[in-house]
Amino acid sequence: MQFHLSGFHPGDPRIHNPQARVVAPPIKRPLPSHCDVVIVGCSPAGLNLAAQLSQFRDIHTVITDLKDDRLTVGQADGMACRTLEMFQAYGFAEQVIQEAYGVNEVAFWKPDPSDLSHIARSSKIDDVEEDLSEMPHVIINQARIHDHFLNVMKHSAAETEPYYARKLIDLTVDHANEEYPVTLTFERAVTHSQFNREVETVRCKYAVGCDGARSQVRKSIGHELVGDALNQAWGVMDVLAVTDFPDIRLKTAIQST
């Protein structure tokens, strides 16, 4: 079933009334002074880990994020087959498949040899090789994946919910403290990402940085991002296209002249 006919709107698309889809804003509450695990960042990796740990009532997990609230518009949308297999373990793979667009084929276009001012389809292949997985490759807004993880967390044994509007200032490790060796210091926002000097401190056994490429966790422990960068210009657009391009609903690679 196609849910999003006129662009993406946050919330569960099975709820027809857009106003009813809106989730209540998070309750403002102080961070605990001590816990077992602190996850910095409500990224997909952070929410995945929080959802796993939330299944255990005796593990006190805290997850924080810089944003004021849950994600409403995502920054990515591709879900690989293996990712859906993981979602199946959480119990929401089928709902993702129902909401998502299935990528079944890849079409390749290149300049038409008979008229280089035009392009022509040169070939088509299956998007997923045979017997790779029982799950499909799909496209769905990242915000919906966050919603599903948050629902798993909220209804889990530990009833875990994120602490939003927290900016990590510092992380230190005291090896002499065997019970709670890690200390994290956060600055708390008062209104819409306007941070002041209201500081909160949490001591924990383990801290996990899921706060992206410019990770403050990584910086605090003295590490640097190791990897290569490509000197390539590229972009991503999220548009409602009015077009007569025949493969608009396929994953398509177009080679220009």
Predicted features along the sequence, with ranges:
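Glycine-rich FAD pyrophosphate-binding loop
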Residues: A51-D77
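Extreme N-terminal leader/targeting segments of oxidoreductases
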Residues: M1-V37, Q52-I59, E178-Y180
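N-terminal Rossmann-fold NAD(P) dinucleotide-binding loop
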Residues: G46-L47
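Active-site-adjacent segment of FAD-dependent monooxygenases/related oxidoreductases
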Residues: H4, H9, T72-H155, E159, ...
